[in-house]
UniProtKB/Swiss-Prot annotation:
Record's keyword terms, sorted: Chaperone, Cytoplasm, Nickel insertion
Pfam families: UreD
The organism's place on the tree of life at top rank: Bacteria
Subcellular location per the Swiss-Prot or TrEMBL entry: Cytoplasm
Any GO CC annotation of this UniProt entry: cytoplasm
Any one GO molecular function term: nickel cation binding
Function recorded in the entry: Required for maturation of urease via the functional incorporation of the urease nickel metallocenter.
Protein name, as recorded: Urease accessory protein UreD
The keyword Chaperone is assigned to this record: yes
Source species: Staphylococcus aureus (strain bovine RF122 / ET3-1)
Subunit note: UreD, UreF and UreG form a complex that acts as a GTP-hydrolysis-dependent molecular chaperone, activating the urease apoprotein by helping to assemble the nickel containing metallocenter of UreC. The UreE protein probably delivers the nickel.
InterPro entries recorded: UreD (IPR002669)
Family statement: Belongs to the UreD family.
Length: 278
């Protein structure tokens, strides 16, 4: 796509300087912006807040983001607020995100929910390129926005594709399409009467069935405490995926936060940094 057609674009490179991870080659324009990194609680890991200065995604918007994480670098990426997809009467919204992780690099990508309002059409394509020694924690939350009738699924569709490559080999292709006009997404086999959806990937060379079982034990009680469903499965590589159905965003955020904390403490021997958005 020609650069002039992007509604917003962002490029970011993070490298390890011997003491901590730092940024370079930062470029952004139009509706996308990245705030100067912060090192929460004297951490050596920078946290970047990605901002849509327009306040929401509109009819025909196109966004592009490319993040490079060099050898031994670590970074946390998050958004400053929810991604709001408003009605798109003429053309859908597109978002393309590429993440390139080198040796021993680590990416935490924990964004706020994607909210699709009435008559919204949204397409997101993520490409995640890892080496054998790099690792990743990535989350998504999908939430139905306000509609005049109060019904939950009044958006046109939400289409999310995640491609994960390790050493240039495709190991995971996740193609999620929620189209209320063509699918009974409220029924068994889709959302099963729930309205909110959450997912996470964790890839690390130490992931095995024992670790997956331990993570599941950590989060399984939420299904009894809250009205939600939680599942975890091993990816066809050294990683796992988590799926969550619920009626509230806060429940999904709590479960994903528990998983993120478990990873931080048990894999990286550190406490999770509070992102201080509010």
């Amino acid at each position: 796509m020609d650069e002039q057609q992007w509604t917003g674009q962002l490029d970011l490179t993070v490298f390890f300087d011997g003491n901590r991870s730092v940024s370079r080659d930062i470029f952004f324009e139009k509706a996308l912006k990245v705030i100067r990194p912060v090192y929460l609680n004297q951490s050596t890991i920078p946290t970047f807040y990605i901002v849509n200065v327009g306040g929401g995604y509109l009819d025909g918007d196109r966004y592009r983001m490319n993040v490079n994480i060099e050898d031994n670098a670590k970074v946390t990426l998050t958004s400053q607020g929810a991604t709001k997809i408003y009605k798109t009467p003429s053309n859908h919204v597109e978002q393309y995100q590429t993440f390139n992780l080198k040796d021993n690099a680590y990416l935490e990508y924990v964004a706020d929910p994607i909210i699709a309002y009435e008559n919204a059409k949204f397409y997101q394509h993520n490409t995640l390129n890892l080496n054998n020694s790099s690792s990743l924690f990535y989350t998504d939350i999908l939430t139905p926005g306000y509609s005049k009738t109060g019904e939950a699924f009044k958006y046109q569709y939400m289409h999310l594709i995640n491609e994960i490559y390790i050493e240039d080999e495709l190991v995971t292709y996740d193609n999620l399409l929620l189209n209320p006009n063509k699918q009974s997404i409220n029924e068994i086999g889709y959302m099963e009467h729930y309205s909110h959806y959450g997912s996470a990937y964790f890839i690390h060379e130490d992931v095995n069935q024992k670790l997956i079982d331990s993570v599941y034990e950590t989060i399984s009680s939420y299904s009894n405490t809250f009205d939600c469903r939680v599942a975890i499965s091993q990816l066809p590589t050294h990683g796992f995926a988590v799926r969550i159905f619920a009626y509230r965003t806060q429940i999904i955020e709590k479960i994903l936060g528990t998983i993120q904390s478990y990873i931080a403490e048990n894999i990286y021997d550190r406490k999770l940094d509070f992102l201080r958005k509010y």
